[in-house]
């Protein structure tokens, strides 16, 4: 088991970039966080490893009580953030935009990484357009994978409301059905893609880590409850700093990050997790403009009737890039 002391000591010795990312001077010069107890969502997916790898970094930021709260699904997890029960999360952008459009008080702070989603299909599906009239497995309607695929379909002129049938199953069941040809495609997420490749189930139709335009936009964002951010700006910035440092850790030390995920029960298969972390560009938050990602996805979701708000309204009312811009200057390396 990797202890807190071992984790921080090893990262501090991870080379020049590691030292820069983890140096405490800036954090200690700031006021203490307004709250010392912090709750974050606990959901499946190796790609959001920064949220879990950040645990010890959050403690170093002054949060003495850090806990991860598990809900029934991703939609319920976002509802918990909106209610303030769990004030902070890292999650897929699409569902967050839908919740904001419905009036939930969520604020986007930063894009965390690109990638995550890989669409696997039978030989009858060679492109996204071939999904018309087909059945696709997803784990939950309104989840990140469902909303991402809806966006991808909108990009090629399909209407996910009528051109495809979504079949809701667990990941294991969807993989089985795809292998047996009982569904035509499965929208895989994070380490599931590594398992499907290893088991030689289906073929890749779309990989959001490498295929344009998806590879140009962040998949997962850090979001916060609006009231929490207003009342606790220091805590909000410190939490964001810990997660972005953890994203850098995932880029530089994917093996160690994967080990933390498995040891602490956030993932099961070390090899699948480490393969996922090695493939994802976790340092893109430094250079990408998160507003560009919001514009891109908001247009797609508006086209298929999933949101009513314009990209301009979403950006103006539900984003706050101040902390991100400050951290881009602070965490140079």
Annotate the PLM regions:
Residues 231-309:
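Secondary-structure end/capping motifs
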Residues 94, 173-263:
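Pocket-lining segment of extracytoplasmic ligand-binding domains
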Residues 58-63, 210-215, 282-290:
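Short, solvent-exposed loop/beta-turn-alpha elements that line the ligand-binding surface or hinge
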Residues 302-333:
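Conserved C-terminal helix/tail region of periplasmic/extracytoplasmic solute-binding proteins
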């Amino acid at each position: 088991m990797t202890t807190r002391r071992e984790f921080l000591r090893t990262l501090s010795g991870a080379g020049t970039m590691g030292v820069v990312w983890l140096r405490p001077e800036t954090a200690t010069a700031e006021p203490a966080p307004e709250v010392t107890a912090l709750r974050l969502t606990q959901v499946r997916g190796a790609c959001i490893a920064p949220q879990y790898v950040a645990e010890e970094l959050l403690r170093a930021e002054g949060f003495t009580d850090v806990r991860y709260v598990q809900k029934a699904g991703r939609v319920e997890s976002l509802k918990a953030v909106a209610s303030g029960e769990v004030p902070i999360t890292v999650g897929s952008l699409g569902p967050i935009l839908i919740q904001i459009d419905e009036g939930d008080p969520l604020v986007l702070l930063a894009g965390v990484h690109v990638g995550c989603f890989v669409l696997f299909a039978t030989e009858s599906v060679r492109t996204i357009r071939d999904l018309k009239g087909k059945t696709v497995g997803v784990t939950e309607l309104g989840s990140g994978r469902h909303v991402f695929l809806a966006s991808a379909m909108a990009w090629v002129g399909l209407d996910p409301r009528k051109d495809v049938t979504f079949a809701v199953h667990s990941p294991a069941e969807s993989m089985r059905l795809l292998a047996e040809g009982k569904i035509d495609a499965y929208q895989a997420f994070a380490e599931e893609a590594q398992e499907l490749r290893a088991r030689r189930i289906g073929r890749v139709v779309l990989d959001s880590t490498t295929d344009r335009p998806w590879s140009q936009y962040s998949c997962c964002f850090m979001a916060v409850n609006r009231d929490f951010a207003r009342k606790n700006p220091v805590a909000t910035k410190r939490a964001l700093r810990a997660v972005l440092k953890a994203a850098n850790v995932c880029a530089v030390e994917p093996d160690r990050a994967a080990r933390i995920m498995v040891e602490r029960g956030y993932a099961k298969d070390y090899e699948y997790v480490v393969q996922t972390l090695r493939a994802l560009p976790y340092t893109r938050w430094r250079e990408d403009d998160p507003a560009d990602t919001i514009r891109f996805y908001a247009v797609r979701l508006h086209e298929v009737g999933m949101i009513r708000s314009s990209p301009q309204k979403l950006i103006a009312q539900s984003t706050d890039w101040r902390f991100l811009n400050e951290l881009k200057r602070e965490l140079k390396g």
